[in-house]
């Protein structure tokens, strides 16, 4: 984007890592058919059935920059998921993975037009999959100059992409 991002992190984004697990349900067990979301001792845990007979369990949040899953994260996710869905202890463990989600200093996403031809929509942290459709719709409307459309106006001023910027984009 005209060199604005070269060698810099002007938006103050940080990687928030999350461990996630995959299990395989044995054929003799009835698989769960709905997403299960819960809190165990103030920790969020979710169990997601997949069409291939596997289950995804997630996810932790950490900012330690380790590349792989943490033993503590794997242990905590398994323990919490089994407390919520006890039959999981009979599943086959397939893998533990880690991914990075972009976070902002105040954990609010960046969503806004910063100049003609440049709309920023990022920093959704652990809610990215939930807010992706909203971010895409509003981002497209901002880029096309049609926001707000259909009489639906949501105040997105708190999501100003430049609120933490270390540099100003060229105008």
What are these regions (language model features)?
Residues 1-116:
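Active-site substrate-recognition segment that forms the wall
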């Amino acid at each position: 984007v005209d060199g604005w991002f070269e060698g810099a992190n002007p938006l103050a984004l940080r990687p928030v890592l999350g461990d996630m697990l995959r299990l395989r349900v044995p054929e003799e067990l009835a698989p769960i058919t709905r997403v299960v979301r819960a809190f165990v001792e103030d920790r969020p845990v979710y169990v997601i059935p997949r069409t291939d007979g596997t289950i995804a369990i997630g996810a932790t949040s950490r900012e330690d920059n380790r590349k792989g899953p943490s033993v503590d994260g794997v242990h905590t996710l398994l323990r919490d998921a089994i407390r919520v869905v006890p039959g999981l202890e009979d599943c086959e463990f397939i893998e533990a993975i880690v991914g990075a989600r972009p976070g902002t200093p105040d954990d609010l996403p960046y969503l806004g037009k910063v100049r003609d031809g440049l709309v920023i929509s990022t920093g959704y942290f652990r809610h990215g999959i939930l807010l992706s459709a909203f971010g895409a719709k509003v981002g497209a409307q901002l880029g096309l100059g049609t926001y707000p459309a259909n009489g639906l106006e949501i105040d997105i001023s708190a999501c100003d992409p430049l609120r933490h910027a270390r540099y100003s984009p060229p105008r």
